[in-house]
């Protein structure tokens, strides 16, 4: 289980140890990105669940700095459907498809990898093991090894890949800063989790199982509502979680914010081009409601100890550090609602969902 859920039971050294195999590969992955970038025009991220959260966050950053390549992020099932309808989208040697799955067993991602086996596009896989099903189709594979921190490991490897591509094709001069910053990221993640323990306990004290919880974020910070709100709180406990993009907040959603509802709102404010959107949302809550009328909290992705992390890289990894800050909230919320971190899932892993419909 992720060490960040209970930072008091571990240490920054243990955190780094769990990510050792990843840290050792950062430069190799970046080098692969640089070498591959010279002959591509498109980068297509393909994943599901937390991997898709990573992909979308990276795309938000490439949208800001990219000029010469096209970057897209697809849910694996959507990508498979598109390939079936239009196989030519991957029969192009100037396209790089980036596949990721922590387990290496996600069925729609595995099917995408199988479909790509004999296609002209370039491909790369990020997963736990080179022996996984996802890695069995001959694609270049980078593996995290056995680790409690698979989510962070895959994010770090994929970010290194993108750093190499941006360096080669987008005149991005921050690759050395990225690699050095990622080397110290495990310590920053651990410190953020330590910082999150008491706020998590305080939040859990006013939370109930039937309270809706809204995560509002923008830009690269969109990874936080998806990875923590959906992939942890909703998946493990069945809580009613809603994720809202800051750009959409004032278009209908704002009307759901009412004092009579027992809802909670967590605002994640990034340090990227989308920051003004979230500052507008924060201003709405500050100006429209008196203290205590609405349960809302503001978390700045810049509000954590980032010792050794380049400030410009902090804009990219800040959301991951913010997600680490929230991780200890999960066991606190579980205890407050009579659940545990080890409760079995109700449906996931028990229903063979992919392509289960009648032909």
From Swiss-Prot:
Q: Which GO terms describe its biological process?
A: carbohydrate derivative metabolic process
- Location of the SIS domain: 28-171
Checking Pfam families in the record gives:
SIS
List the SUPFAM superfamilies: SIS domain
Q: What domain of life? A: Bacteria
Q: Which InterPro entries match?
A: SIS_dom (IPR001347), SIS_dom_sf (IPR046348)
| GO MF annotation list | carbohydrate derivative binding
Q: Which UniProt keywords apply?
A: Plasmid
Name of the protein = Agropine synthesis conjugase
């Amino acid at each position: 289980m992720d060490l960040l859920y209970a930072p008091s039971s571990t240490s920054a050294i243990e955190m780094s140890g769990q990510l050792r195999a990843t840290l050792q590969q950062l430069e190799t992955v970046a080098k692969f990105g640089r070498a591959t970038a010279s002959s591509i025009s498109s980068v297509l991220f393909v994943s599901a669940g937390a991997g898709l959260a990573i992909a979308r966050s990276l795309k938000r950053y490439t949208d800001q700095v990219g000029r010469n390549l096209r970057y897209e992020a697809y849910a694996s099932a959507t990508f498979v459907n598109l390939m079936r309808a239009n196989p030519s989208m991957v029969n192009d040697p100037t396209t790089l498809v980036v596949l990721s799955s922590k387990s290496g067993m996600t069925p729609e991602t595995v099917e995408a990898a199988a479909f790509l086996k004999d296609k002209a596009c370039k491909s790369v896989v990020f997963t736990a093991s080179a022996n996984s099903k996802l890695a069995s189709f001959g694609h270049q594979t980078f593996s995290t090894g056995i680790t409690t921190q698979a989510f962070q490991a895959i994010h770090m490897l994929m970010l290194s890949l993108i750093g190499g591509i941006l360096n080669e094709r987008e005149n991005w001069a921050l690759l050395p800063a990225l690699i050095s910053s990622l080397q110290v990221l495990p310590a920053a993640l651990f410190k953020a989790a330590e910082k999150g323990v008491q706020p998590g306990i305080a939040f859990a004290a006013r939370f109930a199982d039937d309270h809706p919880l809204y995560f509002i974020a923008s830009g690269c910070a969109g990874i936080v509502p998806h990875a923590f709100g959906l992939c942890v709180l909703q998946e493990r406990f069945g809580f009613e979680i809603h994720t809202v993009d800051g750009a959409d907040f004032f278009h209908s959603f704002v009307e759901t914010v009412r004092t009579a509802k027992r809802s909670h709102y967590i605002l994640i404010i990034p340090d990227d081009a989308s920051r003004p959107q979230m500052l507008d949302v924060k201003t709405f809550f500050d100006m429209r409601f008196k203290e205590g009328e609405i349960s809302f909290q503001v978390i700045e992705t810049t509000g954590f100890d980032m010792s050794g992390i380049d400030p410009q890289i902090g804009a990219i990894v800040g959301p991951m550090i913010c997600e680490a800050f929230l991780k200890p909230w999960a066991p606190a919320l579980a205890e407050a609602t009579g659940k545990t971190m080890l409760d079995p899932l109700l449906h996931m892993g028990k229903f063979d969902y992919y392509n289960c419909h009648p032909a």
